[in-house]
């Protein structure tokens, strides 16, 4: 039994809680620095030549589950451990402290009052009147008072004692919500062209929701850099009701039936071109990260040089489209919707560049618990600021003295500044 109590004491200790918080904060920082949720090959390729911190390569990142920190077993273990520690601490320390704070403490000897942090002695002629005036003054100032014929016990701000347990309770809710989201949450990221749609299928095979991209627009700064992405989406849930149309943008997601739909990214997915008298051709574009973060392109056959190819690259929907020989020499540039240029002996025209919107769809059943936990933690933190004050007054008939004293769990100097007012009331009797 002693071993069990030692284990419980250790689990609920402040040192362990601080250590766990440190490791959780460190893990969260790692999850910020290392991209989360990418393909395994991306980690292996990106960290092959340049390991993270000079030590951790892609294989080690995958082995340590650093590619999905917040749903990794060790991170969930830390959250569970902290939650258990908080529950044990609340049960063994916070709850008994709260119960003790709710009990009235009755001092019936002057020596007890003299030992308090703040204490005074006042000579009074009419003890009954002094006790009554002090009682009325405390009541009017919001104190909870218990009075007897020759003594008073009063307290104020007891609600502040509920703060620490509420903070613990809120943090436990937060961790339960975070764990539930990590275990049961799902996310889907999809690039859609205007007119295209995505069907979200429930586990039982029933089509729950259809999301269709009606329009996509990129707002750019004068220097051509993207400033904002706007997607007009249409949602239908299979019912007979009219589809719902909404607009989403970066930092302005859409919440619908427990899902959160984000405007996450953008891309160039295709290009419409015409070669000579050919019909309009739609060619797919692929990202070329070797040439830059936002560069897309396609390889075209070089009709003038058998076995060789021409590289078309483009970085925005407004162009220009750049053409390079296989040796890397620039051939020409064509603006979408602009003039034709001769390439491979053919008049070549770039008619239009097709954009696609990066839609991120998240389902996180733990979000309500996280919000509730945050609200409880915030309320508990605010309540904890309230200082709990206690005051006692005792009249001794044999020497005609009224002893008055008090204590406070915080802001004792502020409480001491209130004492002259109480003494003035007593002396006026």
UniProtKB/Swiss-Prot annotation:
Protein task: Required during biogenesis of c-type cytochromes (cytochrome c6 and cytochrome f) at the step of heme attachment.
Name of the coding gene: ccsB
Assigned protein family: Belongs to the Ccs1/CcsB family.
Protein name in UniProt: Cytochrome c biogenesis protein CcsB
Cross-referenced InterPro entries: Cyt_c_bgen_Ccs1/CcsB/ResB (IPR023494), ResB-like_domain (IPR007816)
GO cellular component, one term: plasma membrane-derived thylakoid membrane
Signal peptide: none
Transmembrane feature ranges: 14-34, 72-92, 162-182
Keywords: Cytochrome c-type biogenesis, Membrane, Thylakoid, Transmembrane, Transmembrane helix
Coiled coil location: none
Source species taxonomy: Bacteria, Bacillati, Cyanobacteriota, Cyanophyceae, Synechococcales
Subcellular location: Cellular thylakoid membrane
Species: Prochlorococcus marinus (strain MIT 9211)
GO biological process, one term: cytochrome complex assembly
Subunit-level organization: May interact with CcsA.
Membrane topology: Multi-pass membrane protein
